[in-house]
Amino acid sequence: MAQLLVLYHTPTDSVAFDRYYQETHIPIAQKIPRLRSYRISDGPVQALAGTAPYLVAILSFDSMADISAALASSEGQAAAADLRNFASGGATLLIYDSKSL
């Protein structure tokens, strides 16, 4: 399984971020093709060291090829472009392949 991990940094207005993320961004991101699951952190995120992100989103796909195709799609491009509309604190995006142990 391949993952897209999004670490959203603390926004300037958390109320506006939360509202926009729930009402606008999630519906946009859920349209990304080949998306198998979409999970987000629930409540405050704690870091064992360093600064904790404000919100964590994990989008799962069957393969790295599926992530590449999804991000290249019009829906993936729309979701990426939408970040500038609400992620005032910035975001770190990581993609990786995972395996169960």
Predicted segments with their positions:
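Macromolecular interaction modules
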Residues: 1-101
